[in-house]
Amino acid sequence: MSKTWRIAGINFDHFHMGDLLKMAHDHPNAEIVGVADEQPERMENAIASFGIDGAQAFTDFQQCLDQTKPDVVILCPATAGHADWTERVAPAGVHILMEKPFAASLADADRMTAAMKQTGKELAINWPLRWIETHVTAHRLIQEGLIGEVTETHFYDGNRGPLYHGADKIEKEPSAQEKDASWFYKKDEGGGSLLDYLGYGTTLGVWFHNGAKPLEVVCMVDEPRALEVDEQSITVARYERGLSSYHTRWGTFSDPWTHQPQPKCGFVIKGTEGTISNYDYEKNVRVQTRSQPEGYEIPAAPLEAPFANPVQYFLHCLETGVPVEGPLSVETARIGQQIVDTAVRSASEKRTIALLD
């Protein structure tokens, strides 16, 4: 790369902003030129950690855009604000890396795509699970034909709860007041485990299914009496070749990056010629094939630059003109969002729903 990419981080609703800014800070051809958030205290850690000058920190996002003139904006708003924030920032003529999920609804996702189409700039949706080595290895093995055609994906994932950790997975113990105040627990801001985690499973599921869409979806959520959002959901999607399941959970016994809980977090994938289990943060994937039905392990291959994290990958695509592919692409993420929207309606109406379009 010859160009130094100017990057701004706007809206710190999601603590993943710290992780993404660290990736930008560590990139040899990227420079953090500005950060913006209406609550200045939420920027303090980033300012201190990455040596951001006080003049580069703003409480007004438009001033940040006007004065720092970034090439790329990283956005981490609450889920319900993804479309609004894309429409606010896109007119600056910047590329946007949006932290997961895609959007609060399919309609919002289409608004985001339309806003970016007007500028001719790129939009990518980051899913942190896309950068887990076991999942990348599983996808490679599927593409190599090791287990034949994928017929089922089964996903169980989550954590102890969104307030039990911050940037860099630093553990915290949330107070009742923090829970009450957090957007994660507010329905009108896109909170709940379903909207937080189901898109992971469905979007990576699209990747594993090679772009196939289900025909219909049924979903059930828990209904905690003291909360306005769910902490657990189970979605079943019927494809032409079989059923796949996606289970989200806030309240796992342990966080998977510390100790894998039971059930384990990650995927089990069944194909016509074998199976793969690829769990979060593990060193190997486990495979069964016709010739070795007893199963064996394959080491998860390390990720290498420029394919080791979303900032590296997005800048590589922008630099080379290679299209954004896989879960970060709008095309794949939109199918994942179709399944999420259908699941939301199914849970609300308590019935099976044909895939929404």
Where does each model-flagged region fall?
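Predominantly a Rossmann-like dinucleotide-binding segment in NAD(P)-dependent oxidoreductases
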Residues: 130-225, 350
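N-terminal Rossmann-like dinucleotide-binding module
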Residues: 1-51
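Beta-loop-alpha module in the N-terminal Rossmann-like domain of NAD(P)-dependent dehydrogenases
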Residues: 39, 50-115
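Rossmann-fold dehydrogenase core element
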Residues: 111-129, 149-153
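C-terminal glycine/acidic-rich active-site capping loop/insertion
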Residues: 128, 170-180, 257-331
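C-terminal helix-rich "cap/oligomerization" subdomain common to oxidoreductases
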Residues: 1-4, 9, 30, 72-74, ...
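Contiguous beta-strand/loop segments that form the cofactor/metal-binding neighborhood of enzyme cores
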Residues: 3, 196, 201-283, 311-323
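Hydrophobic residues in well-ordered beta-strands that form the structural core
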Residues: 98, 123-125, 278
